[in-house]
């Protein structure tokens, strides 16, 4: 009885304690807290968290966002992984496409690399172009056109080597420039080969030259030298390039045939436009009244008699420095024979070729040419009477 009473008392205390404490009842048929209505075990996540284990404020929202993000497929998830694999496949396809494009580009560049530069020098290329032309001469543009058509390597690299062709044409003596004819319009001069440079290649092979060809003297310098030497009279004709090319040497007189090889001809030195005076005016305006008639008679007699005049002693005393001073020995001194070589020879030649025009000019300058010679010889000209007596006018 006591035990039962005590037991009833304890059951009553237990019932009071159960009523005083709030118990969260999940369901009526729950026999155990860890099982649901079907008797299955609950997951620990479905149980509510105790108050002391509750998270900080805002943590459920973050957890909900994480769960929602976990449910949605993305690039980093397995579904996304499969997509990434597809992307990788696309990358592989792109890589394969890029490799095909690179192979195609390599195939296109392969013909360019297969073009090998010809083993000929620029001089050999220019020589080929000139020799194949019908006229054996070409302009710079014609030479470049031949090289481009003949060799594909130079066709693709055309602008780069044109200056090299121009420099080789100008700097090598084996190429000669020919000016363009007046009736042949166009641009640029012609270029041809020097005739002496035909054997500069070994056995006609353009791969190797024997030696560098050098011209001894350029043709235009020879022509200029010939023109310059012709202005020096007979001595210019005796030079190594004194006569133009194409004329025989006998066309010009030898300087030894001249009477005075050390005196050039006076004819070209005389002024052609010398004023000509009438004979009467010339006699009045002579340097000396007594010398005017004598010079005229002497020139007229020299034109018929010869080129050398031999003078004889006259009855009158000779004109000399001793006669002016008054010495007696000068009056009795015999006069020597005098030959008037240079002045009279020049005068006689001029009178024979141009009797009218140059005779007056020579008469005007004859005292200047003859007086110094006669003074040195010690005798002056003879009087007119002695000249007429010895050589009468014919």
Curated annotation (Swiss-Prot):
One of its GO terms (cellular component) is nucleoplasm. Gene3D superfamilies: Winged helix-like DNA-binding domain superfamily/Winged helix DNA-binding domain. GO terms for molecular function: DNA-binding transcription factor activity; DNA-binding transcription factor activity, RNA polymerase II-specific; RNA polymerase II cis-regulatory region sequence-specific DNA binding. Residues 19-31 have a biased composition (Acidic residues). It is found in: Nucleus. InterPro entries: FH_FOXD3 (IPR047392), Fork_head_dom (IPR001766), FOX_domain-containing (IPR050211), TF_fork_head_CS_1 (IPR018122), TF_fork_head_CS_2 (IPR030456), WH-like_DNA-bd_sf (IPR036388), WH_DNA-bd_sf (IPR036390). The keyword Repressor applies. Residues 1-99 are annotated as: Disordered. Keywords: Activator, Developmental protein, DNA-binding, Nucleus, Repressor, Transcription, Transcription regulation. Residues 32-41 have a biased composition (Basic and acidic residues). One of its GO terms (biological process) is anatomical structure morphogenesis. Its main location: nucleus. Residues 77-99 have a biased composition (Gly residues). Binds to the consensus sequence 5'-A[AT]T[AG]TTTGTTT-3' and acts as a transcriptional repressor. Also acts as a transcriptional activator. Promotes development of neural crest cells from neural tube progenitors. Restricts neural progenitor cells to the neural crest lineage while suppressing interneuron differentiation. Required for maintenance of pluripotent cells in the pre-implantation and peri-implantation stages of embryogenesis. This is Forkhead box protein D3. The lineage of its organism: Eukaryota, Metazoa, Chordata, Craniata, Vertebrata.
């Amino acid at each position: 009885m006591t035990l039962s009473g005590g037991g009833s008392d304890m059951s009553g205390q237990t019932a009071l304690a159960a009523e005083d404490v709030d118990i969260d009842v999940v369901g009526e048929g729950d026999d155990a807290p860890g099982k649901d209505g079907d008797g299955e075990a609950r997951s620990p996540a479905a149980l509510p968290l105790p108050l002391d284990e509750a998270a900080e404020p805002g943590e459920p929202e973050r957890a909900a966002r994480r769960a929602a993000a976990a449910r949605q497929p993305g690039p980093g998830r397995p579904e996304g992984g499969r997509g990434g694999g597809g992307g990788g496949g696309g990358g592989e396809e792109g890589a394969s496409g890029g490799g095909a494009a690179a192979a195609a580009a390599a195939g296109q560049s392969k013909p360019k690399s297969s073009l090998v530069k010809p083993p000929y020098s620029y001089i050999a290329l220019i020589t080929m172009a000139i020799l194949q032309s019908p006229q054996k001469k070409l302009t710079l543009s014609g030479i470049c056109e031949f090289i481009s058509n003949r060799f594909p390597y130079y066709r693709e690299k055309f602008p780069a080597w044109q200056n090299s062709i121009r420099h080789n044409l100008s700097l090598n003596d084996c190429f000669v420039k020919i000016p363009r004819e007046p009736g042949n319009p166009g641009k640029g001069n012609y270029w041809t080969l020097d005739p002496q440079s035909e054997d500069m290649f070994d056995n006609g092979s353009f791969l190797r030259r024997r030696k560098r060809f050098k011209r001894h003297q350029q043709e235009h310098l020879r022509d200029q030298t010939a023109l310059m030497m012709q202005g020096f009279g007979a001595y210019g004709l005796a030079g190594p390039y004194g006569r133009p090319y194409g004329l025989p040497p006998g066309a010009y007189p030898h300087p030894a045939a001249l009477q005075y090889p050390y005196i050039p001809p006076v004819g070209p030195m005389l002024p052609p436009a010398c004023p000509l005076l009438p004979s009467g005016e010339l006699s009045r305006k002579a340097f000396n009244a007594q010398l005017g008639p004598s010079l005229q008679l002497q020139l007229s007699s020299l034109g018929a008699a010869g080129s050398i005049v031999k003078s004889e002693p006259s009855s009158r005393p000779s004109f000399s420095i001793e006669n002016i001073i008054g010495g007696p020995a000068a009056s009795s001194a015999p006069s020597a024979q005098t030959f008037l070589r240079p002045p009279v020879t020049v005068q006689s030649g001029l009178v024979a070729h141009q009797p009218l025009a140059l005779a007056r000019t020579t008469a005007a300058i004859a005292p200047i040419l003859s007086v110094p010679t006669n003074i040195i010889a010690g005798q002056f000209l003879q009087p007119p009477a002695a000249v007429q007596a010895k050589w009468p006018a014919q």
